């Protein structure tokens, strides 16, 4: 009889091949044939047929109900690693039920190994007590707090668990940890069910397709983080120093904006609100919408030593004081030179540097007030302090 084998390796790569065997062919011999085709050692393989794991190596394939034209699933067992502090590092990659976070895909095999071990223990009737080895939330918590590297990874990749960890409440941390482990085990069971489902079931195939698509997205993100990590950083916007009516301003240079705009408060501060022509009122549309109060047809803007003519559309509410749009940039033949980090006024040849992040207005700064790093560092220090105090009390 001809059997089709759908192979899923430990690294989630897939392969499909066919084998011609007799119904009285024993399972352990079938595993050897699969090893020749897939390259996976026979002792690391599991065969699933009709959502059932074939475990008796000395039974014939026919005794399991296999017949000509059937498909079986070949799964590679997870690597059994020694129980070590790496378990705590694996927790840093545990993501909740939502989309995967950057850098988590590389640790998925280890996570599945943990869930498989947990399931096998429950299936054999072994009870994992709250204080048993690294399954103890208290021990996991202390290990994470004692490793700044793992703690920083946890805050980046699993914020909810990190928040529970830094709260100093062991019960809250245990609850979040167990909930995430339970969700991960359910997802793993669903994955195995889909792989062993009827290959002609449209719903199952759609779910498998979605899982493959999500895996491709995670792999693409992992490659991007490794090869081009700078693409995940935030970029400071382009601002320059200028003056309007002698009032110093920080203007946002935006070549994607059609017109130059100024907010109402800034227009009042620069004493040009009296020149607003309200016949030009309207609505500015972009990412959102803003009400245009009117237009100042002619004003003077000073950039370095140059005094340039400019017109402004006055917006009722706008976080930035002023935005230099394409109308003004084209009129004065301005060019944005990112290599030298300057704005060049083409009509005069004057250059003005773009502002560094520290000089940007509050609305444009990437971090305002106490940065998240500083805040999280304080939380970490407090959590470690409480942990040390608790351990000291237990010793006494």
Swiss-Prot record:
Belongs to the DDI1 family. Residues 84-137, 367-396 are annotated as: Disordered. GO terms for molecular function: aspartic-type endopeptidase activity. SUPFAM superfamilies: Acid proteases, Ubiquitin-like. Residues 387-396 have a biased composition (Basic and acidic residues). Residues 1-81 form the Ubiquitin-like domain. Gene3D superfamilies: Acid Proteases, Phosphatidylinositol 3-kinase Catalytic Subunit, Chain A, domain 1. One of its GO terms (biological process) is proteasomal protein catabolic process. Residues 104-118 have a biased composition (Polar residues). Disulfide bonds: none annotated. This is Protein DDI1 homolog 1. Probable aspartic protease. Seems to act as a proteasomal shuttle which links the proteasome and replication fork proteins like RTF2. Required, with DDI2, for cellular survival following replication stress. Together or redudantly with DDI2, removes RTF2 from stalled forks to allow cell cycle progression after replication stress and maintains genome integrity. Keywords: Aspartyl protease, Hydrolase, Protease. It comes from the Eukaryota. Pfam families: Asp_protease (PF09668), Ddi2_HDD (PF24669).
């Amino acid at each position: 009889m001809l059997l089709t084998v759908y192979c899923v390796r430990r690294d989630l790569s897939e392969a499909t091949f066919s084998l011609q065997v007799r119904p009285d062919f024993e399972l352990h011999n079938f595993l050897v044939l699969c090893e020749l085709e897939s390259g996976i050692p026979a002792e690391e393989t599991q065969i699933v047929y009709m959502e059932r794991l074939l475990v008796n190596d000395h039974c014939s394939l026919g005794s399991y109900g296999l017949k000509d034209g059937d498909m079986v699933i070949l799964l590679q067992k997870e690597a059994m690693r020694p129980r070590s502090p790496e378990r705590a590092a694996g927790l840093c990659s545990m993501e909740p039920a939502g989309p995967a976070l950057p850098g988590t895909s590389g640790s998925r095999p280890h996570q599945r190994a943990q869930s498989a071990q947990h399931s096998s223990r429950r299936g054999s009737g072994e009870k994992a007590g709250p204080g048993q080895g690294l399954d103890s939330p208290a021990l996991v918590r202390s290990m994470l707090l004692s490793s700044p590297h793992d703690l920083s990874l946890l805050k980046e990749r699993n914020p909810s668990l990190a928040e529970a960890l830094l709260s100093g409440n062991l019960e809250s941390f245990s609850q979040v940890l167990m909930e995430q482990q339970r969700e991960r085990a359910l997802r793993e069971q669903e994955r195995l069910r889909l792989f062993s489902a009827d290959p002609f079931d449209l719903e199952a195939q759609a779910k498998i397709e979605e899982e493959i698509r999500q895996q491709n997205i995670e792999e693409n993100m992992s490659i991007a983080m490794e090869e081009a990590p700078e693409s995940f950083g935030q970029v400071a916007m382009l601002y320059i120093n200028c003056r309007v009516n002698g009032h110093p301003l920080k203007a946002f240079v935006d070549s994607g904006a059609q017109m130059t705009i100024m907010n109402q408060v800034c227009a009042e501060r620069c004493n040009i609100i009296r020149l607003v022509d309200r016949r030009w009122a309207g609505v500015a549309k972009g990412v959102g919408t803003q009400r245009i109060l009117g237009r100042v047809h002619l004003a003077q803007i000073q950039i370095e030593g140059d005094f340039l003519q400019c017109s402004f559309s006055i917006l009722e509410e706008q976080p930035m004081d002023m935005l230099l749009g394409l109308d003004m940039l084209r009129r004065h033949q301005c060019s944005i030179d990112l290599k030298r980090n300057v704005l060049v006024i083409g009509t005069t040849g004057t250059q003005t540097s773009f502002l560094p992040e520290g000089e940007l207005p509050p609305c444009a700064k990437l971090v305002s007030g106490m940065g998240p790093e500083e805040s999280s560092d304080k939380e970490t220090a407090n959590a470690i302090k409480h942990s040390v105090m608790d351990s000291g009390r237990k010793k006494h």
